[in-house]
Amino acid sequence: MTDIAATLNHAGVPCWEYGLTAVDAYCGHVMKSPIGFYLVEGSIVDLARNFENLEYPSLPYADASLGTEAGDLEARFLCVENLSERSLGSLALTDFRRNPLDGRFHDPRDLYPLLKDRIFDPGSEGGENALFETALYLSRLQSAPAMSIKVPPPPTSAAPLWQKDLLSLILQGERSAAAFDFLKDSGFIKKYWTDLDALLLVDHAKDCHPEGGGWSHTMEALGYRKSRDLTVSLAILLHDIGKPHSASSEGRRFDRHAEIGARLAARFLRSLGFSSRITDDVAFMIRWHMLPAALPRIPISRVSDVVLDSRFIDLLEVFRCDEFSTFKGPDVYYASCAAYKAFMRNNRNPYRDQEGRKKAEIYSRL
């Protein structure tokens, strides 16, 4: 039971997890940066009595919300008169719920057979928040065989928190690419996330990127993640958004795209309300995502401030996904890791400089 559920239970306010939170619990999916959906039998007044820093976003799934100021878990609260109410969202799967006190699931729409096989089949369902809900479930579950998903048009307006939740939750799913392709087909990406949409205009050379253009490459890279860490996933998603705005120079087709992309990514994340820490970390990884490939060939001491940064380990994961998505094999990545490990070993050795030379030999030449 989460601290939020425990707080409400102690106050005598009944609550259940529902929708994606209940589905994740059933499937054993754990998010590193969780956003919990809670069904509350009470009012926002009851919530305000128990939580400081409560906000009221007036979203289809959130009468009230808590950010990370309250702890590691963000929460979105939907207030109802009775916990047994149905039609909580636009899709039947959103009615799936779990009692956090005893861990029991409640399935008023008889969806267990599909969930058991990790299948998502919305049929012809639709509604105000259908695009949001469909994208989230597509990031977790497999589409039913031969199913044609109804693609709703993008909303006429999309609040920053709604977009931030959508992006954060999709990226913490195993099937992120399926959800992003769905959003692309709906026109949402083109309307709201234009920097991502511009990747469709990036045409890669087939010998370097047999997986396809900018969009296909990015979706392929997401599939190589070892974890669903939100910050690393954001960096992978946005690592090439500078390419549509870069120019060829001295044999480099997308010259300075990393620097451009870092600025665009920071602007995008700030506009959605991501924390300064996440924004800065993502911008750092995008700015330097080309560096690991050069480590075996350059004096690493020249870029020691970057390599010694605590975020460089995460940067190597971004590089691995970027490199593996091109089907080149692991050789370049392993060579970069070997160079990095050698540098770090020498950096800790008091008898050698950062390039591995014995310091006594260096001093003898002076």
Regions found by a protein language model. Name each.
Residues M1-L366:
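Catalytic cores of the polymerase beta-like nucleotidyltransferase superfamily
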